[in-house]
Each structure stands twice: as C-alpha cells, then as structure tokens.
C-alpha cells in the first residue's frame, strides 16, 4: 500500500474553488511558487496546532516563493470563513465535501493530507514521503522554474 501512496512526478490536477472572500482561486495559477497543497478540516481537534505549524513555515518561506493552497472540507461554509479570515495564505472551500471529485483525483484517504508542488506545477511528494517538511520546502525553493 505504501507504493500506491507515492507520488509519481505528475502535473498538478487543476483545482479552482472559492476562497474565504468568494473569489475563485486556481491552484495552477501558482506556477513559479513552491506550493503546499493542504487538504484540511478546521473543525478537527488537531487543526489549531497544525495551523500554528503552517503559519511558522509560511512566515519563514513566503518571501522566497512559498505558498499554501489549503482546501477545507468543513461542512459549514460560514464556519470555514470565520476560521480562515485571519490566515495569510490561500484558503478555499469545497462545497462538495466528502463527495468531492478532488478527493478522488488526489487519492485522499484521510484528512489532513498534504502535497508539495514544485515551481513547475509538478506534484513532487505526498506527506507520507516527507520526514522533514522544513527541509523539503527549502529544497524545492532552491530549484528553478523550467
């Protein structure tokens, strides 16, 4: 099963969803940045701690070209908006929830799950393949756009 969880180097599967201000945000528009694609539920008990870790990474690397594209699977859109209003990165909400085709496309078995996408919009690694997220982000920030 570990083999199927690995990411083959693939182009990003497009996602365009409304953000917490109602604007459509496209994942593929972030080409040129190193992106953490994060599938998240703000109503989960580990959410607050996870957000603190992400904020530290974002603050440390955003100026170098790191972005977070966080997809919420909370069932209540208002709750999602209140939970994300102070977050500096891109937070989008999938109104299809657990029935979303995006979850199928990215083979999401559980949430939270994240991926690292390089500056060329190529999926590079899935969370289970990453031991040191900080070092992983540094590595991909050091790679150029082709």
List where the protein language model places each region.
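Alpha/beta-hydrolase fold active-site loops
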Residues: 33-35, 112
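Hydrophobic beta-strand anchors of alpha/beta hydrolase catalytic cores
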Residues: 36-37, 68
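Structural microenvironment flanking redox-active thiols in thiol-disulfide oxidoreductases
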Residues: 48-85, 98-102
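Thiol/disulfide oxidoreductase modules built on the thioredoxin-like
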Residues: 97-142
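Generic structural signal for well-ordered beta-strand positions
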Residues: 25-26, 124
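N-proximal helix/coil linker or "cap" segments that precede and/or mark the start of modular domains
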Residues: 1-18, 28-31, 59, 78, ...
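Conserved redox-active cysteine motifs that mediate thiol-disulfide chemistry
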Residues: 31, 38-56
